């Protein structure tokens, strides 16, 4: 038997929280700190707030009983946008913000329906990103479609908080069980119903029983499961929480391990309740003695305020080395001129061993204000490092301007150590301020991340990457949810150019952007000659670029009005007698407040990595809430010593990627080079008209119920709304986006280059089908180490028993794979074999699974289990019109290929 590597080490790491900050705490069985944020584009409506309160109140009781008296909602904040009128009952927010909220209320993009869903793309047990409710869902009666709003909220909360998945499958609504019966994909199998085809015309609908497809053995396309309204089954909330009888999650006893749903695929066939009980929330939480929640939730109404930002910049002696002061000033100038939105209040503090307020808060109204603030950037570096004095001066600059520190932001940049940071931790906690930290160089204080993590701020690290600071400042954009206030970075490139040489480049500007567009060039020795040409041939020269007045070696051009759509071309000439480094940075904003731009965001799966366990790089590329597909996404990770690792990210539903074609691009990272801070940036690029939008409904959502059977009669709900917007286009233009993913910290790694020694990733997309008397298999190739390189060999086993293969893979019949040579990770694998020594007859049912082995003789987890049934299709006119009760259909003579993502 091939030895296996115990994978508990890195699977445990996946259960740690990801990069998104959350202020939610579970204390004495009650959840505190939940934020429900309303998007600024949502019209003011008092009923919306009232319905949110009613939803959460109902959800609290439902959650309490569903978790067997373990948890309930105690304190919830509703964040109201600045676009709404002020009221006396509205309080000032602290660290609460739209971009960090657990729940957002926002309109769908392209009228794509009102299904509540959770953005969730991590592994089993990992928290999701946010829950999305539309105003229409909260304001209209959707009781027949989703059940009550409170129940739908609990369904989504389970996705968000505990990392469990849906127990239905819209793509594969039926499967053939090991008893050779057609079953609806559901949990539990005790939920009863009827299968029908629904046909609607002219406002009326009729139904007929489903027929079996003579080629697959399953029901025909568009066959729909209609549940009985009156049920006795109590499970499961992750299938159909709308049923009155459903009040629990599926347990080990009631779980349907055969169902081809995402819960089985992602959680190795574990029940939802088993995953919930293994969460950190429940490990030290005992059931309460009360039969009902102790209290109803308490709500705080918070109204967003205008943005308040204070720069707290290090000018200690160490900042004079490696051009750090220059680089800091270049990046800070870019932030002040190009990133911070107009109407914001901005202040500046510098510090060494003492601190000085350079600017009290000043409202950004025009270019003169920008110039007045940037004129105070520090020109000399000397003295020691006192971070606490810098922070306290930042608080003072805010308070002296009659503003509250609550909800204000501080951008703290330093390259030095400070042993006294602990002395102001409590003051930082009480201030309510949000601190974004930028560590410059390997000696920056190790406590910086504590400040950003505890206040809900971003964390960044910059070292050898000359654009690292610029990328960090560019990422600190508005947190309000308004698309017009977001700065979008199109280019950030550093170019080492020899003397008297030209370098050329292109930047695509697509039709979703173009407002407030800047081209910025920096240099290390002498200003280069600059040529820039727009898509219509208009040229801009060096004289058009405005040089800064601070001698920080930067020049910028602001494109008047809206930048032309198409490809912009730039050329730079190093006219100095020596080589120098030139940088090009391009930023812009949305073209229209009604059309969301294409955006890219990135983060690591956790803030702290422990060698040799892997971490996952995630990048989300979307337009509004629609995924963008078919593009090249590249991650660049810089280690503490300045070494760069480049990874191509994939959206192929294999390896680190949970779901194919969901706009989430991901990859494992294992190339560790010592301990310390690592930084992440991601470049997303669409060229040659390859990009397209996905108009599919999102994953991880409350099921849209087509109707119910009541007293023997089918009562249909309105059909799910289709995308009807004339602007909905599957194809989108070429574009370029660059974003910083912040930083993460590595521990336990030896010095030098020591990539993790780990097994290949688990295969999760194995498919099988019969071709005459052979079985054809297909899957996505894993790698030598997770998803990097290629595996050494495969183990394929086959059984007639699903449970035997699942529980005792090593003793199932081995398939001869001597002719099978693994391909590079991410490639399509295909293999055909004759299932010997089994006798093959009509109705013979096989289950197959695969393991991959790497060159270190480490084996992957067992793949999902694929099913193949041998059958001879019946003549079309002999196929009976079946489809009444789900449990009554025997398929002994049918065969199909299907994925049962079980293990």
From Swiss-Prot:
Tissues showing expression: Trachea.
Residues holding Zn(2+): 155, 159, 166
GO terms under cellular component: apical plasma membrane; plasma membrane
Membrane topology of the entry: Single-pass membrane protein
Transmembrane segment boundaries: 883-903
A biological process term (GO) from this entry: proteolysis
Designated name of the protein: Calcium-activated chloride channel regulator 1
Species this chain originates from: Bos taurus (Bovine)
Domain comment as written in the entry: The metalloprotease region is responsible for autoproteolytic processing. It can also cross-cleave other CLCA substrates.
Endpoints of the signal sequence: 1-21
InterPro entries: CLCA_chordata, CLCA_N, CLCR, Ig-like_fold, VWF_A, vWFA_dom_sf
GO molecular function: intracellularly calcium-gated chloride channel activity; metal ion binding; metallopeptidase activity
Localization annotation: Apical cell membrane
Family stated for the protein in its record: Belongs to the CLCR family.
Domain VWFA residues, every copy: 308-476
SUPFAM superfamilies linked: vWA-like
Post-translation changes: Glycosylated.
Entry superkingdom: Eukaryota
Active site location: 156
Region of interest: Metalloprotease domain: 45-199
EC annotation from Swiss-Prot or TrEMBL: 3.4.-.-
Function (record text): May be involved in mediating calcium-activated chloride conductance. May play critical roles in goblet cell metaplasia, mucus hypersecretion, cystic fibrosis and AHR. May be involved in the regulation of mucus production and/or secretion by goblet cells. Involved in the regulation of tissue inflammation in the innate immune response. May play a role as a tumor suppressor. Induces MUC5AC.
Pfam family, one: CLCA
């Amino acid at each position: 038997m091939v030895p296996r590597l115990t994978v508990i080490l890195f699977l445990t790491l996946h259960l740690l929280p990801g990069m998104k900050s959350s202020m939610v705490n579970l204390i004495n069985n009650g959840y505190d700190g939940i934020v429900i944020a309303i998007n600024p584009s949502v019209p003011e409506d008092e009923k919306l707030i009232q319905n949110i309160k009613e939803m959460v109140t109902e959800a609290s009781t439902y959650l309490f009983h569903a978790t067997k008296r373990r948890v309930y909602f105690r304190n919830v904040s509703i964040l109201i946008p600045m676009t709404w009128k002020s009221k006396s009952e509205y309080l000032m927010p602290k660290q609460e913000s739209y971009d960090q909220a657990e729940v957002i209320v926002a309109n769908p993009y392209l009228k794509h329906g009102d299904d509540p869903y959770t953005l969730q793309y991590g592994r089993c047990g990992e928290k999701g990103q946010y829950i999305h409710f539309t105003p229409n869902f909260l304001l209209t009666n959707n009781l027949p479609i989703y059940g009550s709003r409170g129940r739908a909220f609990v369904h989504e909360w389970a996705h968000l908080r505990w990392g469990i998945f849906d127990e239905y499958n819209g793509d594969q609504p039926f499967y053939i069980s090991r008893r050779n019966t057609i079953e609806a994909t559901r949990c539990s199998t005790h939920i009863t119903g009827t299968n029908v085809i629904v046909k609607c015309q002219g406002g009326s609908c009729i139904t007929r029983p489903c027929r079996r497809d003579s080629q697959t053995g399953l029901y025909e396309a568009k066959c729909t499961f209609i549940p009985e309204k009156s049920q006795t089954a109590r499970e499961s909330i992750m299938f159909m929480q709308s049923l009155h009888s459903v009040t629990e999650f599926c347990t080990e006893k009631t779980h349907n391990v055969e169902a081809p749903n995402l819960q089985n695929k992602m959680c190795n066939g574990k029940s939802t309740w088993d995953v919930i009980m293994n969460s950190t929330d429940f490990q030290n939480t005992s059931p309460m003695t009360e039969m009902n929640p102790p209290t109803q939730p308490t709500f705080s109404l918070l109204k967003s305020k205008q943005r308040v930002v204070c720069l707290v910049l290090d000018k200690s002696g160490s900042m004079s080395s490696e051009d750090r002061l220059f680089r800091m000033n270049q990046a800070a100038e870019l932030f002040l001129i190009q990133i911070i939105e107009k109407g914001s209040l901005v202040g500046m503090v510098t510090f060494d061993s003492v601190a000085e307020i350079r600017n009290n808060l000043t409202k950004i109204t025009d270019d003169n204000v920008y110039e007045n603030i940037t004129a105070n950037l520090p020109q000399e570096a000397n003295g020691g490092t006192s971070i606490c004095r810098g922070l306290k001066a930042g608080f003072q600059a805010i308070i002296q301007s009659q503003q509250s520190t609550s909800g204000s932001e501080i951008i703290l940049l330093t390259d030095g150590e400070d042993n006294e940071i602990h002395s102001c931790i409590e003051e930082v906690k009480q201030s309510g301020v949000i601190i974004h930290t930028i560590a410059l160089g390997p000696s920056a204080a190790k406590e910086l991340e504590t400040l950003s993590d505890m206040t809900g701020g971003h964390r960044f690290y910059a070292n050898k990457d000359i654009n690292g600071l610029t990328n960090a400042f560019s990422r600190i954009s508005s947190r309000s949810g308004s698309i017009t206030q977001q700065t979008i970075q199109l280019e950030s490139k550093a170019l080492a150019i020899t003397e008297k040489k030209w370098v050329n480049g292109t930047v695509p500007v697509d039709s979703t952007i173009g407002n407030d567009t800047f081209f910025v060039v920096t240099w290390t020795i002498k200003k280069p000659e600059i040529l820039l040409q727009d898509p219509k041939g208009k040229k801009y020269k060096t004289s058009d670029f405005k040089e800064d007045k601070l001698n920080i070696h930067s020049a910028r051009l602001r494109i008047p009005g809206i930048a032309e759509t198409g490809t912009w071309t730039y050329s730079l000439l190093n006219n100095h007698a020596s080589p120098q480094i030139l940088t090009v940075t391009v930023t812009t904003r949305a073209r229209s407040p009604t059309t969301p731009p294409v955006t890219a965001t990135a983060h690591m799966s956790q803030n702290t990595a422990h060698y040799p366990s892997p971490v996952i790089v995630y990048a989300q590329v979307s337009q509004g809430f629609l995924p963008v597909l078919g593009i090249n996404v590249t991650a660049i990770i810089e280690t503490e010593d300045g070494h760069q690792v480049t990874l191509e990210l994939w959206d192929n539903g294999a390896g680190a990627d949970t779901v194919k074609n969901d706009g989430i691009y991901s990859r494992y990272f294992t190339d560790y080079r010592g301990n310390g801070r690592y930084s992440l940036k991601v470049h997303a690029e669409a060229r040659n008209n390859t990009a397209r939008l996905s108009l599919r409904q999102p994953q991880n959502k409350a099921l849209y119920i087509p109707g119910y059977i009541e007293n023997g009669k089918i009562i249909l709900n309105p059909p799910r709304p289709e995308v009807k917007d004339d602007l909905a286009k599957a194809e989108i233009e070429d574009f370029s986006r660059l974003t910083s993913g912040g930083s993460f910290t590595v521990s336990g790694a030896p010095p030098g280059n020591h990539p993790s020694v780990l097994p290949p990733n688990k295969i999760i997309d194995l498919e099988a089908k019969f071709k005459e008397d052979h079985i054809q298999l297909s899957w996505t190739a894993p790698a030598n180490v997770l998803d990097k390189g290629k595996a050494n060999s495969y183990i394929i086993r086959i059984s007639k028993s699903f449970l035997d293969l699942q529980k005792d893979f090593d003793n199932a019949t081995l398939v001869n794979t001597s002719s099978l040579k693994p391909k590079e990770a991410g490639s399509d694998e295909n293999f055909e074999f004759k299932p010997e020594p089994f006798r093959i007859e009509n109705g013979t049912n096989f289950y197959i699974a695969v393991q991959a082995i790497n060159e270190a003789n480490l084996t992957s987890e067992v793949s999902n289990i694929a099913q193949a049934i041998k059958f001879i299709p019946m003549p079309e006119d002999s196929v009976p019109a079946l489809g009444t009760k789900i449990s009554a259909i025997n398929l002994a003579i049918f065969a199909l290929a299907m994925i049962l993502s079980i293990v």
